[in-house]
């Protein structure tokens, strides 16, 4: 998993509340267990017209936001079913940070396991960031995970809070497998001592 230390990029505004995982990645795209290629299905029902052509009114289809790395979204983002394809689709599109006032718990935790930083902010701060994100190609935010700080296009900044363990995992690019490998030497030491103490079980 790629490390997340500092991210600077275009932030796309999505001022919609209760965006569920079916909206993020419709069920038609759940037939694969590959993490790549799902970016085309991200918000598919909103991004595409019935004939499959791009819906030019949807924010991620607008030229200024086609390479967005950050999503500023309404309250309760990622609610609904627990499909891990939702963060996979966001990541495959190129989005590595989602900012909202709240997230569904399962989606929130799945983000960290896939290298995405979900940031919780107050409604006041979200309104400010949503306004910043509405500046089109000038909607540049910098997310500094080391200092827990968001800097806007005007140079103003705001702080956010994050569980220290989750912060450690993102800063070091550690998913569940990576965390286990961090303890590889301790695991190996235990296995050897346990085998010596219980040779009949070896």
From Swiss-Prot:
Enzyme Commission no: 4.2.1.33
Q: Which domain of life is it from?
A: Bacteria
Which pathway does UniProt place it in?
Amino-acid biosynthesis; L-leucine biosynthesis; L-leucine from 3-methyl-2-oxobutanoate: step 2/4
A Gene Ontology molecular function term of the record:
3-isopropylmalate dehydratase activity
Q: Which GO terms describe its biological process?
A: L-leucine biosynthetic process
Q: Which GO terms describe its cellular component?
A: 3-isopropylmalate dehydratase complex
Q: Does the keyword Lyase apply?
A: yes
Q: Which reaction does it catalyse?
A: (2R,3S)-3-isopropylmalate = (2S)-2-isopropylmalate
UniProt keyword Amino-acid biosynthesis present: yes
Could you describe the subunit structure of this protein?
Heterodimer of LeuC and LeuD.
Its job = Catalyzes the isomerization between 2-isopropylmalate and 3-isopropylmalate, via the formation of 2-isopropylmaleate.
Under what name is this protein listed? 3-isopropylmalate dehydratase small subunit
Write down the species.
Rhizobium rhizogenes (strain K84 / ATCC BAA-868)
């Amino acid at each position: 998993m790629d490390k997340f230390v500092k991210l600077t990029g275009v932030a796309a505004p999505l001022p919609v509340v209760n965006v569920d995982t079916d909206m993020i990645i419709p069920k038609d795209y759940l037939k694969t267990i590959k993490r790549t290629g799902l970016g085309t299905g991200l918000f598919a029902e909103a991004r595409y017209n019935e004939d499959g052509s791009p819906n030019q009114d949807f924010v991620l289809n607008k030229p200024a936001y086609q390479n967005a790395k950050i999503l500023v979204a309404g309250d309760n983002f990622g609610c609904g079913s627990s499909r891990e394809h939702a963060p996979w689709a966001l990541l495959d599109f190129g989005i590595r940070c989602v900012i909202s006032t709240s997230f569904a718990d399962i989606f929130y935790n799945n983000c960290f396991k896939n290298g995405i930083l979900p940031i919780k902010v107050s409604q006041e701060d979200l309104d400010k960031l949503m306004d910043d994100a509405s500046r089109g190609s000038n909607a540049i935010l910098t997310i500094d995970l080391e200092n827990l700080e968001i800097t806007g296009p005007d140079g103003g900044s705001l702080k956010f809070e994050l569980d220290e363990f989750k912060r450690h995992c993102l800063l070091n690019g550690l998913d569940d497998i990576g965390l286990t490998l961090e303890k590889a030497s301790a695991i190996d030491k235990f296995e050897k001592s346990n085998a010596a103490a219980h040779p009949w079980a070896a």
